[in-house]
Each structure stands twice: as C-alpha cells, then as structure tokens.
C-alpha cells in the first residue's frame, strides 16, 4: 500500500467517526465514534512514520502512546457514563444538559 492509500483509509475512518459523534444521541456510540477518530489519527502517525521523509520509530511510539491515552480516556468516559446512568437511568446525550439534581 502507498501513503495515499493509508491517508484515504484514515480520512474515511475519521469522517465516519465525526459523523457518528455529531449525529448520534447514545453516549456509548458517541464514545465509540471518538475512539474511531483517534484510531484514524494513529493510522496517520504510523503511515507517516513509514513513508515520511525521515522514516523511523517515532510515529510508532507516538501511536502507542496515543492508544494508551485513548484507553484511559475511554475508561474515564465509561465511568462517567455509568455514574450518569445511575442518576438519570438513561444514556442519551439530550439528557446530559440537565445535570442538576
């Protein structure tokens, strides 16, 4: 595969994730779409590390670091979602605007 193929794949994944994050009402689906967007960025990091002007492992290391950060973000997001569900008995984004008791 060439660099443009990887970039096209990352663009498609990012656009799917952005569409889902902006249009879906379920918070779990929104979190999954955000993770999809982060994975598209990781594909770019690895592709530029392989096909860039100075190939090296820096892109791979940065992608692994981004995956670790994304895992922590997903854990915090799901913990907040569980707390929200216990309070409101729903996971809809529309209900998140009224977080007062």
From Swiss-Prot:
GO terms for biological process: ATP synthesis coupled electron transport. It is an enzyme of class 7 (translocase). It is found in: Cell membrane. GO terms for cellular component: NADH dehydrogenase complex; plasma membrane. GO terms for molecular function: NADH:ubiquinone reductase (non-electrogenic) activity; quinone binding. It is a multi-pass membrane protein. It catalyses: a quinone + NADH + 5 H(+)(in) = a quinol + NAD(+) + 4 H(+)(out). The chain crosses the membrane at residues 2-22, 28-48, 62-82. Its EC number is 7.1.1.-. It holds the Pfam family Oxidored_q2. Keywords: Cell membrane, Membrane, NAD, Quinone, Translocase, Transmembrane, Transmembrane helix, Transport. NDH-1 is composed of 14 different subunits. Subunits NuoA, H, J, K, L, M, N constitute the membrane sector of the complex. NDH-1 shuttles electrons from NADH, via FMN and iron-sulfur (Fe-S) centers, to quinones in the respiratory chain. The immediate electron acceptor for the enzyme in this species is believed to be a menaquinone. Couples the redox reaction to proton translocation (for every two electrons transferred, four hydrogen ions are translocated across the cytoplasmic membrane), and thus conserves the redox energy in a proton gradient. Belongs to the complex I subunit 4L family. This is NADH-quinone oxidoreductase subunit K. It comes from Geobacillus thermodenitrificans (strain NG80-2).
């Amino acid at each position: 595969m060439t660099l443009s193929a990887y970039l096209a794949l990352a663009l498609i994944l990012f656009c799917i994730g952005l569409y889902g994050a902006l249009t879906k009402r379920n918070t779990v689906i929104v979190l999954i779409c955000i993770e999809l967007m982060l994975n598209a960025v990781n594909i770019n990091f690895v592709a530029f590390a392989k096909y860039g002007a100075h190939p090296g492992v820096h892109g791979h290391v940065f992608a692994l670091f981004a995956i670790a950060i994304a895992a922590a973000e997903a854990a915090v997001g799901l913990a907040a979602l569980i707390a929200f569900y216990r309070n409101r008995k729903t996971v809809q984004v529309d209900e998140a605007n009224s977080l007062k008791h």
